[in-house]
Amino acid sequence: MKFAVIVFPGSNCDVDMFHAIKDELGEEVDYVWHDTENLDEYDAILLPGGFSYGDYLRCGAISRFANAMKAVQKAAEQGKPILGVCNGFQILVESGLLPGALMRNENLKFMCRTVQLRVENNETMFTSQYEKDEIINIPIAHGEGNYYCDEETLKQLEENNQIAFRYVENPNGSVSDIAGIVNEKGNVLGMMPHPERAVDELLGGAEGLKVFQSILKQWRETYVVNA
């Protein structure tokens, strides 16, 4: 399986994402600059955290216009797994690939610590290696991670089982404790916590690795078993 890590000006978690795929998952991965127009050779697309374009205007508001996002949109339409973490989640929302918005944290402070998440839906291509309601420890590092959507959108997220992760103790004011959501098709996941920073027991825990293992399992079942 071949992954692409999209690198925007100001990305700073791309190296962590690359390490998670290459060294921990053991799969092929490339850094791909934001001006690329073709992602056809990749099986999965990863949008890392950071401060793309300095977070000017709004987090992700400029990145959504990058050439690469047209290719990401195409990949999403093709059903390829798209994972956006932290700033990557913000970019997915700004691009319209996921509903809602990310606002300033409720306490108006940047937050950097490990939090507990509850796996709400383990039937997605990103969460199949977890148990439903499993509690996992994943780091956060954000100033604008307060997820918001209107009541109708929240109702749709609930009814369609699109909420992948919830905070056990809400750190930022996100509506309904939401930490991560998928699109209706189930192949686009956005989450504020950083699973790529929780892939090595020597560095504090590996409970985020299952996100990437789930992607790999889905791909193998689809393209290897059926080959």
UniProtKB/Swiss-Prot annotation:
Disulfide bonds: none annotated. GO terms for molecular function: ATP binding; glutaminase activity; phosphoribosylformylglycinamidine synthase activity. It comes from the Bacteria. The keyword Ribosomal protein does not apply. The active site is at 86 (nucleophile), 194, 196. SUPFAM superfamilies: Class I glutamine amidotransferase-like (SSF52317). It is found in: Cytoplasm. Residues 3-225 form the Glutamine amidotransferase type-1 domain. Pathway: Purine metabolism; IMP biosynthesis via de novo pathway; 5-amino-1-(5-phospho-D-ribosyl)imidazole from N(2)-formyl-N(1)-(5-phospho-D-ribosyl)glycinamide: step 1/2. Its main location: cytoplasm. It catalyses: N(2)-formyl-N(1)-(5-phospho-beta-D-ribosyl)glycinamide + L-glutamine + ATP + H2O = 2-formamido-N(1)-(5-O-phospho-beta-D-ribosyl)acetamidine + L-glutamate + ADP + phosphate + H(+); L-glutamine + H2O = L-glutamate + NH4(+). One of its GO terms (cellular component) is cytoplasm. Gene3D superfamilies: 3.40.50.880. The keyword Amino-acid biosynthesis does not apply. Keywords: ATP-binding, Cytoplasm, Glutamine amidotransferase, Hydrolase, Ligase, Nucleotide-binding, Purine biosynthesis. Part of the phosphoribosylformylglycinamidine synthase complex involved in the purines biosynthetic pathway. Catalyzes the ATP-dependent conversion of formylglycinamide ribonucleotide (FGAR) and glutamine to yield formylglycinamidine ribonucleotide (FGAM) and glutamate. The FGAM synthase complex is composed of three subunits. PurQ produces an ammonia molecule by converting glutamine to glutamate. PurL transfers the ammonia molecule to FGAR to form FGAM in an ATP-dependent manner. Part of the FGAM synthase complex composed of 1 PurL, 1 PurQ and 2 PurS subunits. HAMAP family: PurQ. This is Phosphoribosylformylglycinamidine synthase subunit PurQ.
